[in-house]
Amino acid sequence: LAVEHSNVHQQKHFTTRAFDSLICIIAPASFIELAEATLIGWRFVEQKSSLAKSDIIVAYRDNLFHVDSTVLDNPKVVDDLLDALNEFFLCLSYLLANKTQEFSLLHCASYTEAGKNIILLGDKKSGKSAKTLSKTIAGELIYADDLLLWHAKRGIFVALGLPLRLRRTMIPLIDSDTVKDKFIIGKNILYSHQNFFNNAKLGDEFLLDQLKLMSENFDFAIKDIPVYKTLFYLKQHLIAGNFISIKNILQK
């Protein structure tokens, strides 16, 4: 997704609040507008005065996007707007898990199927996104296609309000041009527009009815996980603590 250099890249100060946790952001207003057009249930408020601290900084210079955060070891530098948005969403998710403390972050897809709440586990590129896409097109409620919050003590799962993300190589799986028009297409990935699909918003809670696992053979086969093995498999797919830990203080 090409971006022309202009004043739209001037950085401004924003805050967003989720689960009583405040996240402070410095970023171009146009970038935040795009985030708001794809995220579900998030609200960003521009601050008239400079923030005393920041959790995420997004900058555009030398034709590159620079995304830095207190949860990153080093800034992420990419040349495509949607790739930058992807890094931004990851930082939001990691920060939310860090700031709330009560949630773990689960790598999974999650959706409804025949009235049941499903969580689908699997390795990267095992077929979770393809399965989620088929459920999306079928009109099912999508809780997550990559990351989900888990409150183990309460036994509930909570949506992050992230849009559907697809690799560009998955475009051939979308037969309908009408469906394609509901995605923002970047150099490497696609993001769904807000409100075009039945995506759960930030904070939507649900109980698990069935845990499923993609085949390790990458043949798109799916098996049901018995109840007594649920906890074991969930723990195997948690995002490691080093991803959500605070690593540095950002310099404005």
Give a label for each model feature:
Residues 50-63, 104-114, 149:
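Short, glycine/charge-rich beta-strand/loop segments that flank catalytic centers
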Residues 82-105:
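N-terminal pre-Walker A segment at the start of P-loop NTPase domains
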Residues 126-128:
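Conserved glycine(s) of the Walker
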Residues 131-132:
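Post-Walker A alpha-helix
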